[in-house]
């Protein structure tokens, strides 16, 4: 049972479909993660984070353990944008790993998050992607909850004509929706299911927060939303967005039209714990390097012009010269600013070899109509069918298919060295990928 997907209009008249959150038969359920009670018989290979065992992309036991250690563990996770619950009574459904989540704003203006699972029989309480109501009611037996998740009423709690009903000692206060801790920062709602998670300020660290405030520190508005299914383990996408080495090799549009190249000034900045990262480049500093020709990079062998060159026109929103940036927050959040295309991405595991990737294209409330139009146009660079990002939807599945039969083999991740460390002089490195695996090993106990 579900509702029709919501439509988000774009300023150009184009309509992008918002993701339909109500799960179907293809989505795994939280019960499938319950088997993870202890680490599997698994040992990380020698070589530290410069060697990654292919088994982590295809082993159901490891996937199940991730639900417990990562998605229900002591980490902060992106849940939604604050603007999606901007009004009192607003309701937004999302996912934290395989666990369905509700985010609300109550009548006092406070933001809450809770598991989308009725305390009675475990049914989903909210079925729509977004809604606005004074309370939450489970369609199965009409148990009603406040926007803070507290149980308010139980249908026929006292029975009918004095017969039946709940026992005399039934206490509604003991049957609320399971709450998450919530913090709102830079227009985003973060949640955690663990009481041991440190404050969000500490989890992010100074470097991460500073760059988040650069790109996300103004009031935001949504220009478009869509999602896609990619047929690979979620960690392959987490690697991909941290991999500055591949960006101008696989994505020929970047190289051909000089949007983002390794022969531009730029760098990689890792957070203090190595888990989060920022990759950036400065388009105006391009000095065409011989290495592109020597490496026979296909897109560097010829010159091309766009029939619509206005696609790549930009205005300077910041005074630091950065024109392309990818920022990640471990484990699943990505923030991008490609030219003037601002977006948030996040992934939801849908199985050991299937992932749903969500894209939310953004502007600032202060944008002029011309700036908003440009952001919408440049939204064509990324997304499921983007001029740049299209290839990522395929390449990760190639890795999934290539590695599934070789669980004892490992990936070789030594571009730029063997350590996870910042490098603000070159992006010809896999340092941020190693940083992800550093965090993964820490939290998983591998």
Predicted regions and their residues:
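Residues at helix-coil transition
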Residues: 71-72, 120, 147, 242, ...
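Rieske [2Fe-2S] iron-sulfur-binding domain
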Residues: 2, 84-195, 201-206
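N-terminal short leaders/motifs
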Residues: 33-62, 130-144, 173-186, 277-312
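N-terminal pre-ligand scaffold of iron-sulfur
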Residues: 2, 6-128, 181-184
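Short Pro/Gly-enriched beta-strand edge/turn motifs at strand-loop
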Residues: 73-84, 161-166, 325-331
